[in-house]
Amino acid sequence: MEQVTESRRKPIVVGIGELLWDMLPSGKKAGGAPINFVYHASCLGAEGYAISAVGDDELGKEIVDELDKNHIQHLIEKVPYPTGTVQVELREGIPTYTIHERVAWDHISPTSDAIDLAEKADAICFGTLAQRSRQSRETIQAISSFAPKDAYRLLDINLRQRYYDKELIE
């Protein structure tokens, strides 16, 4: 009897949004919910892609190197804004966050490569935080609209500072 094996393709998972450095008391750590999602999905066997923007600066170079080191595929634009950072302070063990504004991930553009990738996605993750700027909000909504109807859409709701409203969450 001939053995039949089924070849399964890896699911394609896309995270679009903030790529930033969390500036912790112990040092900096790469972060951003959609990119963290892609990292963990990739560790579980998915074909993961990060879509974001970084500045043409040392922090941008370092964070792209971090993605490469962790085998995270990416479509990262270099834009004329600083790479995103979040200052994290601990007060009596409780973290507080200062999320810096007018940074690279506030200026993500809907590239044709990103749209092509979204069309193949089995899951797409994005959040409210990266949609604080009009440009990134329109980009995230445009790119995610190209995902197949049956693709999972995961929304990270971030209720920090003033970067959300009822309309965005709905």
Where are these regions (language model features)?
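Glycine-rich phosphate/adenosyl-contacting loop at the front of the ribokinase-like
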Residues: 2-72, 86
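Residue-level preference for short coil/turn positions at secondary-structure junctions
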Residues: 9-10, 119-120, 149
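Conserved strand-to-helix beginnings and helix N-cap segments that scaffold or border functional pockets
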Residues: 27, 60-61, 111, 136-138, ...
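General beta-strand structural signal in soluble alpha/beta enzymes
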Residues: 15, 76, 153-155
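Short, flexible loop segments at the rims of nucleotide/cofactor-binding pockets, characterized by
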Residues: 26-28, 100-107, 131-132, 158-164
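Conserved N-terminal subdomain of the carbohydrate kinase-like
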Residues: 47-128
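Short amphipathic alpha-helices and their capping/turn segments at secondary-structure boundaries
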Residues: 2-9, 113, 139-145, 168
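Conserved beta-alpha-beta core of the PfkB/ribokinase-like small-molecule kinase fold
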Residues: 123, 127-170
